Each structure stands twice: as structure tokens, then as C-alpha cells.
């Protein structure tokens, strides 16, 4: 029967020459924050004759399950200290992880210093991201959840993947066990390399989350170095066009993302373009507390409205531009009932997002084979994160376009003051205008858009298109929708021609940033028409 001394001799004899493809797993170090599946992994390894070395809470978890483990203190000959801040940071461990087993000098040094080889490391990290995402963690608590030893072990084992394996994802445990069982305790070099790549992605993500947190606490302005990490949520069939590959990634450290909490109840897979439009539609309806609906096409709203119900808001939004709404993405901030579902009628839509659907509505909508029905029952607070746009070889980074804007902060530029109804429609149009690609013009009446001019290089062309839309579709009204309507412009009017075109069509109130060198000319044109105009002092370009 082997004595404790015999076991130690076996450890020393474990220093052996090996080629990169010929490594048998004889010793594993397990140290995890997320204990999911760790007992099953340890049991499987033990059944294969693998010696288990473990730390702190992981060792207690395994011992509680009746699994024999060797404490890290016994392995390193050095106690854990400083409330667990120092437990694995020791040359005996890292020499065992990093030794090249095809190098005589490495093997000589390992033998001389009685280094024991570690063939597999299973580590996952302190929950830094989850701690930050809680929102109520103190700075001290956040700092304590920065893992030091874990990333160091992961990187060491990943660097030496020619001779060691590293596990960072509980989802890989059973696959690794299966290969070990099938291969007489060995993991292939290809498996070890794949695990190493995953490990470095894990530590990169972790460091990016920490870096982002520190950058956010540096004060005003942007840090000298900008790092972000993203994790794949899903592959997409293709990108904007069929010849482009695509996937959707969520930003690491973000408290939510576009599809978080979204359940798809019906329809085909979401496409790249669906997700772009869905994000725009959702951001727009999240602006309103009252029932609201937005219909988006090619990342621009072609209709938006508020109403007494989701159905009423939808019908008003659709009436703005029923031609462009064909194949659109719809977001509504109220549950969909049968009346709403029936109002959709034969309209072809790509996506419908709502907080819920009653049974009758769902049954009626599922007749539309291809429509993607999405439910987001718990709408989180809108994100106001820093945003970035790719340019050649880099990123443009900016704060989100959100600024406190109240009626009291705005100034009337004209002789006539706006009426209360005009204020209501101007503020509604101004809110929608911020979500339209520049140059942007939004015409509104009675809490609904009646014409939108989007993405024009010329502001007067944007006005012309918005007026033409209103004249063509009339916002679903029998009477002239432009008579007494309001206009919002995302930037100032450089000339009086744009406002004049709108005034001639019947617009009675205008809201715009102001600040043009020709403001006096613009004001004179509006005064001459007996209309009202308000300056916000804030521009809302969107590209």
C-alpha cells in the first residue's frame, strides 16, 4: 500500500519528456467561482485517476461531495493569505504550468526544484461584471471582485497549450471528459488549442470590463485608450446583403442588450436588417410613457404616433406612410390585443415587438407565416451608453445623444406664441426627429407624424419630401392634415426656403435649434405667415 511519501515520489517522477501531441492528464487544478458542473467534472477526472488540486471554496465544495482533493497550500508549500488575495501566485504552480516538456533544460530545472507538472487547469473568474451590473455595489466591493490569480493561471495554461489544457466554460466540461475517456486520459492538441483560444478570449473580455469600469470613474472626457469587448449572442444568416457574413454580439459589461429578455413567439430567424430596424424602433417608442407605436424601415421611422391605445397609435403611425410601412419593423409599448392584431390586417410586416400578446391576438397573427413576433415583457430603462461608429482603421466615439430638454428651456423666436396644441405637436415631432437620419424633417398633427423627410443632403429637400408625403397620404385624414400642423427640424434652417415651403403648405408651428446667420430671414418668413417658431438651442444630427 502506498504511503504519503510514495505519493510524493510519484509526483517527482511525473516530470517527464513529452511531445506536444502526447500529453496525458494526470494532475488537474480546479479553482472556480461559478461552481456549476464542477463536482461532476471532478468526479469524472478522479475516475480517470487524475490527481485533483484545489483552492478554498472549490476544495470545500468537492470535499463536501466526497471527492479527494489536495489543497493548494500542500501543492505550493505556501499558505493562502490576505483574505485569499494570495493563494495560487507561486512559482511552484507556474513552473508546473509553463514547463516545456520537450526541453531538457525545463525538465532539468523542474527536477532540481521538485516541480510538479499540472496538465489541466479549470478556472473561472470572480464575478466582476455581475457585481458592476448590480448597480448598487460599492467601489470596494467592485475592486475585491477583480480576480488576479485566476487570469494568471488561465493565461499560463493557455500559453502552454502544447502541453497543458485550460477550461474556462462549464459548457465544455462534459465534452472534455468524453474525450479523455475515449483517448486513455489524453486531450488532442487541436482540442487544447481551441480551449486556449477560448481562454484568452475570456481574459480579454474580463480585462476589457475592468478597463471600462475604471475609465468610467476617471472623470470627464474619454480615456487615452479605448477598449471594449463583445460576446457573441447569435450567428445571423447573412448581413445587410446575402453575400455578407454576420453575427450579433452584445457588449461585455452592458446591463442589457437588444435581445435580452426578448422571446420570439413566431416566425423566421431575425436578420441583420431586422435587428438594425428593431433597435431603432424600440429606442423610439421607449421615449414615450403613453401608448406609442413606431414603424421603421431601413433604420428610419416611416410613421410614429401616440394614442389612447396601442391599436390607435399603430393606425395613426401607419397612416403617415402606408407605402413605406410595407415590410417594416413595428414596436409598440403596450400589449397587443385582438383589435390590434385585426388592425394589422393584410399588411406585410417583418417584425412586431410588444410587451405581450393576448391569446386571441397571437392566434390571429400566427396566420402570417413569416412575421417575427417578439415579446419583451419587462422593458428595461433605456440605455444611455457611449456609442461608437467605425471609420477606416478606427472608431469615432461619442456620448449618447441625450440631453434634458424642457419647454421652459426653449425660446419663442416669432411674434406669435405657440398654442398649447401646437406645443404638444412640436414637442412630439421634436422627439421623433431625433431618431430620423439627417437631414431630418418631421411633420406632426394630433400626436402623430403625417410626413417625414429623412436622410437628405439638402434640408429644403427633406421639407419637400415630408410635405409631399403628407399631401399624398393625408395622415389617413379626410381634411387637410397640413393645415395647422407642426414641423420639427433636427438642425437650423440655413435659408428661409425650407420653412417657406412648409408654411405655404399650411404648417402653423416650427421647432428647430436656431443659430443660423440667417435666423432673422427665417423668422421674418414665419412672422409673415402668422405662424409660430421655437428655438431649442440643441441640434440632433443623426448619421
Question: Where would I find each of the regions flagged by the language model?
Answer:
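N-terminal glycine-/serine-/threonine-rich phosphate-binding loop
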Residues: 2-75
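ATP-dependent carboxylate/acyl-activation modules
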Residues: 9-30, 123-126, 206-208, 212-543
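Short, hydrophobic/aliphatic alpha-helical segments
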Residues: 39-48, 129-146, 151-152, 281, ...
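Anion (oxyanion) recognition and catalysis
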Residues: 46, 63, 147, 158, ...
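Glycine-rich nucleotide/cofactor/substrate-binding loop typically near the N-terminus or early
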Residues: 57-128
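Active-site/ligand-binding-proximal alpha/beta "capping" segment
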Residues: 101-151, 155-158, 406, 411-420
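Mobile "lid/hinge" segments at catalytic clefts and subdomain interfaces of large enzymes
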Residues: 152-153, 160-176
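Non-catalytic interaction/clamp surfaces of large macromolecular machines
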Residues: 171, 175-225
Amino acid at each position: 500500500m502506498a504511503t504519503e511519501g510514495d505519493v510524493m515520489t510519484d509526483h517527482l517522477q511525473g516530470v517527464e519528456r513529452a511531445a506536444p501531441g502526447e500529453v496525458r492528464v494526470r494532475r488537474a487544478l480546479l479553482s472556480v467561482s461559478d461552481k456549476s458542473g464542477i463536482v461532476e467534472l471532478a468526479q469524472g477526472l478522479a475516475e480517470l485517476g487524475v490527481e485533483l488540486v484545489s483552492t478554498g471554496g472549490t476544495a470545500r465544495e468537492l470535499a463536501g461531495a466526497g471527492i479527494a482533493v489536495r489543497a493548494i497550500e500542500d501543492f505550493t508549500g505556501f499558505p493562502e493569505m490576505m483574505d485569499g488575495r494570495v493563494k495560487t501566485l507561486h512559482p511552484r504552480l507556474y513552473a508546473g504550468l509553463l514547463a516545456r516538456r520537450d526541453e531538457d533544460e525545463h525538465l532539468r530545472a523542474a527536477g532540481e526544484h521538485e516541480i510538479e507538472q499540472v496538465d489541466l487547469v479549470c478556472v473561472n473568474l470572480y464575478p466582476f461584471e455581475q457585481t458592476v451590473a448590480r448597480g448598487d455595489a460599492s467601489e470596494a466591493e467592485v475592486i475585491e471582485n477583480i480576480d488576479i490569480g485566476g487570469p494568471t493561471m488561465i493565461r499560463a495554461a493557455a500559453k502552454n497549450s502544447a502541453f497543458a489544457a485550460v477550461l474556462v466554460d462549464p459548457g465544455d466540461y462534459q465534452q472534455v471528459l468524453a474525450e479523455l475517456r475515449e483517448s486513455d486520459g489524453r486531450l488532442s492538441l487541436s482540442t487544447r488549442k481551441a480551449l486556449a483560444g477560448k481562454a484568452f478570449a475570456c481574459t480579454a473580455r474580463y480585462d476589457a470590463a475592468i478597463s471600462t469600469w475604471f475609465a468610467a470613474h476617471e472623470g470627464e472626457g474619454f480615456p487615452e485608450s479605448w477598449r471594449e469587448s463583445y460576446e457573441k449572442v447569435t450567428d445571423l444568416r447573412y448581413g445587410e446583403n446575402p453575400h455578407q457574413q454576420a453575427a450579433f454580439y452584445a457588449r461585455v459589461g452592458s446591463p442589457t442588450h437588444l435581445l435580452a429578455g426578448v422571446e420570439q413567439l413566431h416566425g423566421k430567424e431575425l436578420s441583420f436588417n431586422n435587428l438594425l430596424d428593431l433597435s431603432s424602433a424600440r429606442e423610439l417608442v421607449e421615449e414615450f410613457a403613453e401608448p406609442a407605436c413606431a414603424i421603421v424601415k431601413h433604420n428610419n421611422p416611416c410613421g410614429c404616433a401616440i394614442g389612447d391605445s396601442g391599436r390607435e397609435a399603430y393606425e395613426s403611425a401607419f397612416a403617415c406612410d402606408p407605402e413605406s410601412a410595407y415590410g417594416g419593423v413595428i414596436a409598440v409599448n403596450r400589449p397587443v390585443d385582438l383589435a390590434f392584431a385585426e388592425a394589422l390586417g393584410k399588411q406585410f410586416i417583418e417584425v412586431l415587438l410588444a410587451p405581450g400578446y393576448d391569446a386571441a391576438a397571437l392566434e390571429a397573427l400566427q396566420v402570417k407565416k413569416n412575421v417575427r413576433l417578439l415579446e419583451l415583457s419587462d422593458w428595461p430603462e433605456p440605455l444611455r451608453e457611449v456609442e461608437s461608429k467605425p471609420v477606416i482603421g478606427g472608431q469615432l466615439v461619442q456620448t449618447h445623444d441625450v440631453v434634458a430638454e424642457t419647454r421652459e428651456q426653449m425660446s419663442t423666436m416669432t411674434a406669435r406664441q405657440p398654442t398649447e396644441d401646437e406645443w404638444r405637436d412640436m414637442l412630439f415631432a421634436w422627439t421623433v426627429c431625433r431618431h430620423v437620419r439627417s437631414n431630418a424633417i418631421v411633420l406632426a398633427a394630433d400626436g402623430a407624424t403625417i410626413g417625414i423627410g429623412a436622410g437628405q443632403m439638402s434640408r429644403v429637400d427633406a421639407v419637400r419630401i415630408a410635405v409631399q408625403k403628407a399631401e399624398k397620404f393625408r395622415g389617413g385624414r379626410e381634411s387637410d392634415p397640413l393645415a395647422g400642423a407642426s414641423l420639427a427640424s433636427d438642425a437650423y434652417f440655413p435659408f428661409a426656403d425650407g420653412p417657406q415651403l412648409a408654411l405655404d403648405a399650411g404648417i402653423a408651428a416650427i421647432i428647430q435649434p436656431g443659430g443660423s446667420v440667417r435666423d432673422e430671414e427665417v423668422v421674418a418668413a414665419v412672422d409673415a405667415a402668422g405662424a409660430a417658431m421655437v428655438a431649442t438651442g440643441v441640434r440632433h444630427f443623426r448619421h
